[in-house]
């Protein structure tokens, strides 16, 4: 039986774009590269964008990898999203699947960034997400990655499910969907390439 979490749906991350109340140092290099695969994903991408732009940690770049979307509306939405902020970049490639799109995003990410964070085009993050993951990794140097719990929603309500299964670790590891990972460590293990046909 599903347990419905009692949250005001109007307040979920990304519902609105909030005003940032601090100055951003234009000379500061990006520290985090957010990688988002995109394939005809225009339905939720604007809310995903808002949840990124609302972050309390401002030193990021957002690399959206269009994985060969054929839909014209999807392409137009990407153009709109890219104009929202100078830290947003849209890349285009032939369709090759989610894993290949993520690897392409990693390859094309700013060489100065220290961390890679994966965020799918229909996912939202709380406004302190980047800040919390960043400081968790900075203060735990032996850790390679950080992630949080998730709340699912179906477009109308939030749903809480205990759906993790350790048997999924190798073929369908859901913990990486919004994880932040040290870029050097990720590259050392070959990113997603070797598991491309099985990855989510």
Regions found by a protein language model. Give the residues of each.
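A conserved acidic beta->alpha catalytic loop
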Residues: 66-77, 96-97, 120
């Amino acid at each position: 039986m599903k347990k419905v979490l009692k949250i005001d749906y109007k307040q979920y991350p990304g519902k609105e774009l909030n005003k940032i109340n601090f100055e951003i140092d234009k000379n500061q290099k990006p520290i985090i590269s957010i990688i988002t695969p995109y394939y005809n994903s225009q339905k939720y991408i604007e809310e995903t964008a808002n949840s990124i732009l609302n972050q309390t940690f401002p030193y990021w770049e957002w690399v959206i990898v269009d994985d060969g979307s054929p839909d014209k509306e999807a392409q137009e939405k990407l153009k709109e999203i890219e104009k929202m902020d100078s830290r947003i970049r849209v890349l285009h490639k032939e369709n090759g699947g989610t894993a290949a799109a993520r690897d392409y995003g990693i390859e094309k990410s700013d060489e100065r960034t220290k961390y890679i964070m994966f965020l799918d085009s229909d996912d939202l993050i709380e406004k302190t997400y980047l800040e919390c993951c960043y400081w968790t990794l900075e203060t735990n140097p032996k850790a390679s990655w950080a992630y949080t719990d998730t709340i699912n929603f179906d477009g109308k309500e939030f749903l809480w499910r205990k759906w993790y299964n350790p048997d999924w670790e190798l073929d369908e590891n859901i913990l990486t969907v919004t994880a932040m990972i040290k870029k050097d460590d990720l590259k050392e293990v070959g990113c997603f390439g070797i598991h491309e046909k099985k990855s989510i």
